[in-house]
């Protein structure tokens, strides 16, 4: 009895799983950077690995206690759908939390967060 068909099936499943994992839009560059200490930034900027679905992707800035800091909507750059920004008001010295949701154009969704400090 040969195990060749089973091996081929296993390889196919692993290949499909690997391709699906790459379809998620994960951050490749963030400004401000995670755990950084900065002067009040004018915006939060995140570059993603995949193009984003503008209506479903967002950035939110909160205080460490969870209060929303910026009421402005985030936006995906029309010239570069991998780039999303959130305009910020002048921030007081404190720790802030960037919460992001990325939905790739193929529908895959990821969420994450990171902190930075304004001095």
Language model segments and positions:
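N-terminal signal peptide c-region/cleavage motif recognized by signal peptidases
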Residues: 18-20
């Amino acid at each position: 009895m040969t195990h060749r068909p089973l091996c081929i099936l296993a390889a196919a499943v692993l290949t499909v799983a690997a391709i699906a994992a790459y379809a998620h839009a994960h951050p490749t560059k963030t400004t401000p950077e995670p755990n950084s200490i900065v002067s009040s930034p004018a915006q939060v900027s995140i570059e993603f690995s995949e193009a984003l679905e503008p209506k479903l992707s967002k950035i939110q800035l909160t205080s460490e206690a969870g209060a929303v800091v910026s009421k402005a909507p985030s936006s995906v750059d029309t010239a570069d759908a991998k780039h999303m920004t959130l305009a910020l008001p002048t921030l007081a010295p404190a720790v802030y939390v960037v919460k992001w949701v990325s939905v790739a154009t193929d529908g895959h969704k990821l969420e994450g967060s990171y902190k930075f400090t304004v001095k």
